[in-house]
Amino acid sequence: MTDLAIIWTNGRGDIAQDGIDMLTDDSLTTDVTISLFTDRRALDSDTLPDGSDDRRGWWGDSYRDRPIGSRLWLLSREKATPDTLERARGYAEEALEWLKTAGRVSAINVRAEQLHQGWLYLYIALTLPDGSVIPYEFKAAFNGV
């Protein structure tokens, strides 16, 4: 499926352009970026980072079997502890699982690290059905995940 191409630069997603034209993309890159960095609705059991009752999410998920996005935003006020990094890894895997269910990939491998103070690094390897592997690296500020 072709979507607007999303690029990840300086810790933020943006629509890819060529001059004044918006570019399209049918690779996994846009799917992965949207899956990771769109706010998925928090579960009732999740603790919300700002203490509000705003569980975020996309209203269209009310009509879908599979919600869009990830719960990485729940980590926005967390300190980078081993537990937080494990949650980040789990949230990323959860967000990307639909690629496996849809047959777009056969395996998903996610690693979460903090290499610099206040930054979350996600290393993702997606194995395609033909066995080839596509690597992705994302960097996001913990105060803006």
From Swiss-Prot:
Keywords: Host cytoplasm, Late protein, Viral baseplate protein, Viral release from host cell, Viral tail assembly, Viral tail protein, Virion
Expression induction or repression: Expressed in the late phase of the viral replicative cycle. Expression of late genes is activated by the viral late transcription activator C.
GO annotations of cellular component type: host cell cytoplasm; virus tail, baseplate
Cross-referenced Pfam families: GP46
Subcellular location: Virion; Host cytoplasm
Knocked-out gene: effects: No tail is synthesized.
Entry superkingdom: Viruses
GO BP annotations listed: viral tail assembly
Job description of the protein: Component of the baseplate. Probable connector between the central and peripheral parts of the baseplate. Probably involved in tail assembly.
Assembly: Part of a complex composed of three DNA circularization protein N, three baseplate hub protein gp44 and three sub-complex wedge (made of two copies of each baseplate protein gp46, gp47 and gp48) that forms the baseplate.
Protein name: Baseplate protein gp46
